[in-house]
Amino acid sequence: MDNQHKKIKGYRDLSQEEIDMMNRVKELGSQFEKLIQDVSDHLRGQYNASLHNRDEITRIANAEPGRWLAIGKTDIQTGMMAIIRAIAQPDSF
């Protein structure tokens, strides 16, 4: 498993500092994943608590919190991958 990335075409050897930075990014990714799940759980609870309140259901539907959470999740994933790519500096597209 040592230097496993050597076997992946287009990737160079990483320094220990770069490996540590990549691990920090991965750790932050896990924290973001937990936060996104917490927000999703909150939204589900908010919706379920409002089932008998048509005005609140309409307000929630108009605000589109699920859509915005999905956009946020995708953008965070994209950002995390961009940071990883900046650290790894692969030589291919």
From Swiss-Prot:
Tagged with keyword Nucleotide-binding: yes
Keyword set, alphabetical order: Nucleotide-binding
Binding site for 3',3'-cGAMP: Q4, Y11, K26
Disulfide bonds: none
Residues annotated as binding 3',3'-c-di-AMP: Y11, K26
Superkingdom of the organism of origin: Viruses
Impact upon substituting Y11A: No longer defends against CBASS, no longer binds cGAMP, no longer antagonizes CapV
Self-association state and partner proteins as the record states: Homohexamer in apo and 3',3'-cGAMP-bound form.
Family: Belongs to the Acb2 family.
Name recorded for this polypeptide: Anti-CBASS protein 2
Source organism per UniProt: Pseudomonas phage PaMx33
Lineage: Viruses, Duplodnaviria, Heunggongvirae, Uroviricota, Caudoviricetes
Gene name of this polypeptide: acb2
